[in-house]
Amino acid sequence: MVHYVKMEDGKVMPIQEMLKSIERYNPEHLKVIEAYVEEQARENQYDLEANLACLKLYQFNPHLLNLDITYIILLKALTNFPHTDFVLCKCLLLPAQMNDETVKEIIYLADILEKCDFSLFWSRLAKHPENYQKISGFHDSIRKFVCHVVGITFQTIERGYLMQLLGNVEEKVLLSWLKRYGWKEEGGLVTIATQEDNIKTKHITEKIEFDNLAPLMANCL
């Protein structure tokens, strides 16, 4: 669904177009942007530019700060690991946001994810389920990051360990992820893509002009 904002002259502009203009700093558009953030959570969508614009408006207008929207923005940034979206969002936080207990918890979760301590991440998440319930597709987005890390780290991995890294998932959930990434299971081991699949030979050709060689040849005489 496309969100629109109404300009002072009465014209209507799509929110993506508004975000590319100076109007992104107009606090009158904040409610529309916040509604767009909530839609991202419901519909499993993601728009980093809109979320950063929202945090920037909070910076310029601290009296308009909405902590619930802040939580959604930070949690959505978590779902886009290993990209640096979370760092960008964190840099725009006000002291009032940084001192909030839920924000502190989300930042802690980000630190755990960055260290790839997935077992700790899932156990910590289970203690505060209310923090992410509004984020559609949250678990699967994190599992996608887990599979990314597994794919660049392992050639084979124990089946039970992989299930643990994915959040102690059930059999059918594991099988769906194996199918998604084309991983094969045999004898309790899951085979990830071989090194030959991951490493591609690169042929590098460098063109050297004679004029560039002339000084070097002169020095050799």
UniProtKB/Swiss-Prot annotation:
Major subcellular location class: cytoplasm
Annotated Gene Ontology cellular component terms: eukaryotic 43S preinitiation complex; eukaryotic 48S preinitiation complex; eukaryotic translation initiation factor 3 complex
GO biological process, one term: formation of cytoplasmic translation initiation complex
Subcellular location: Cytoplasm
Keyword check for Methyltransferase: no
Function: Component of the eukaryotic translation initiation factor 3 (eIF-3) complex, which is involved in protein synthesis of a specialized repertoire of mRNAs and, together with other initiation factors, stimulates binding of mRNA and methionyl-tRNAi to the 40S ribosome. The eIF-3 complex specifically targets and initiates translation of a subset of mRNAs involved in cell proliferation.
UniProt cross-references to HAMAP family, sorted A to Z: eIF3k (MF_03010)
Subunit structure of this chain's protein: Component of the eukaryotic translation initiation factor 3 (eIF-3) complex.
Family to which this protein belongs: Belongs to the eIF-3 subunit K family.
Protein name per UniProt: Eukaryotic translation initiation factor 3 subunit K
Organism of origin: Anopheles gambiae
Lineage, highest ranks first: Eukaryota, Metazoa, Ecdysozoa, Arthropoda, Hexapoda
